Design a protein with these regions (language model features):
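A conserved beta-strand-loop-helix scaffold within acyl/acetyltransferase catalytic domains
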Residues: 2-51, 55-66, 112-250
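Aromatic (often tryptophan-rich) hydrophobic motifs at membrane interfaces
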Residues: 49, 57-60, 73, 79, ...
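Conserved acyl-donor/pantetheine-binding loop and adjacent beta-alpha core of acyl/acetyltransferases
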Residues: 65-77
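Long, mid-chain structured domain cores
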Residues: 93-94, 101, 116
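Conserved alpha/beta cores of soluble small-molecule-handling proteins
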Residues: 99, 105, 134-136
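Anion (oxyanion) recognition and catalysis
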Residues: 101, 166, 295
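Conserved GNAT acetyl-CoA-binding A-motif
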Residues: 103-114, 268-278
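Residue-level detector of anion-binding/catalytic polar loops
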Residues: 106, 171, 300
């Protein structure tokens, strides 16, 4: 039996320490990241203790009697340590289902942590989803990921863009000018989809100040004018492109091709470079043009899965 405690702000330090020592948590689960937008979500995260020792965490929010893990994060999932066994994970899911059912929830929607983010094998939760929860897969997004020690050659279309950008004199450098990049990103998203980025420029700068080594911006510039860039989220096993965008001049001159050529040259001391999803948020419909570009750099498929079960 586990003692189940609902997360409160007083648990912040203990929570963050557990995430840092876990086998599958990343800085996205750190409360200094999660809580930047806590006004948008009603938190209902759980902490699982055994004999007074913290064994597992579930980052979650509630909405309309549905429990989500977690709507404000790219991925959710149960956070555990290397010492946690399969039997214990099965027990955790049995007890968390009972807890949330007593609390009046009728459904759980669960975003699993993709395996590329695991520091040690961590798929005990996937087994529990079928054996304990009878969960069903309701959404599968596909991302493009490079195994950094076995990179494929770039395709000719990507090489052509790289040559074009080099001939134009485009320069690649790390930057803290989040406002300049956000303006390019916002214009692109607004023109294409009529939406704004998930993060505001102010939020990105706040998160950068809290995680200076994990959040990094690289820009492609011409005569000091930003033409495009990418914001990278760096975890122990993955460099992930949280945002990628270029203006019209940058697109015509191959700015992003040269940008990723230079970024992929760097020694990141991680296993994977992940370009992120190429599927729509609502329908999982594949954006073929987008995935063509990512696969041109050598990216291949990794899935981000979402499950659902009733209580």
């Amino acid at each position: 039996m586990f003692e189940i405690v609902r997360y409160a702000a007083s648990h912040k330090d203990e929570w963050n320490q557990f995430v840092a020592q876990s086998k599958n948590g990343t800085f996205l689960f750190d409360r200094n990241y999660m809580d930047y937008h806590n006004d948008r979500f009603e938190d209902h995260s759980l902490m699982f203790y055994k004999k007074g020792k913290l064994y597992a965490l579930l980052a979650a929010n509630e909405k309309d009697h549905i429990l989500y893990s977690h709507q404000g994060l790219t991925y959710g999932g149960l956070i555990t340590t290397v010492k946690t066994t399969t039997d214990e994970v099965l027990q955790v899911f049995h007890e968390l289902n009972a807890y949330y059912k007593r609390a009046g929830f009728h459904k759980i929607i669960y975003k699993a942590i993709p395996s590329i983010y695991h520091k040690w094998p961590s798929e005990e939760d996937l087994y529990a989803l079928t054996s304990i929860c009878q969960a069903r897969l309701i959404m599968r997004d596909i991302s493009s990921t490079i195994l950094l020690n076995k990179q494929f050659p770039f395709t000719e279309s990507r090489k052509s863009g790289m040559r074009k950008a080099s001939q134009a004199g485009i320069q690649i450098s790390e930057s803290d000018d989040f406002d300049a990049f956000w303006n390019i990103l916002q214009a692109n998203l607004h023109n294409k989809y009529g939406i704004n980025p998930v993060h505001t420029a102010a939020e990105l700068k706040l998160l950068k100040s809290r995680f200076p080594h994990q959040i990094r911006l690289f820009l492609a510039t011409l005569d000091d004018k930003p033409l495009g860039g990418t914001i990278l989220f760096i975890t122990p096993t993955v460099v992930h492109t949280q945002y990628i965008s270029a203006d019209e001049e940058g697109k015509q001159k191959g700015a992003l091709d040269l940008l990723f050529k230079e970024i992929l040259k760097k020694d990141w001391n991680v296993d994977y470079f992940d370009f992120g999803k190429s599927t729509s948020t609502e329908s999982c419909e594949l954006n073929r043009k987008l995935i063509f570009q990512k696969e041109g750099f050598g990216g291949r498929g990794i899935c981000y899965d979402t499950y659902e079960w009733t209580l």
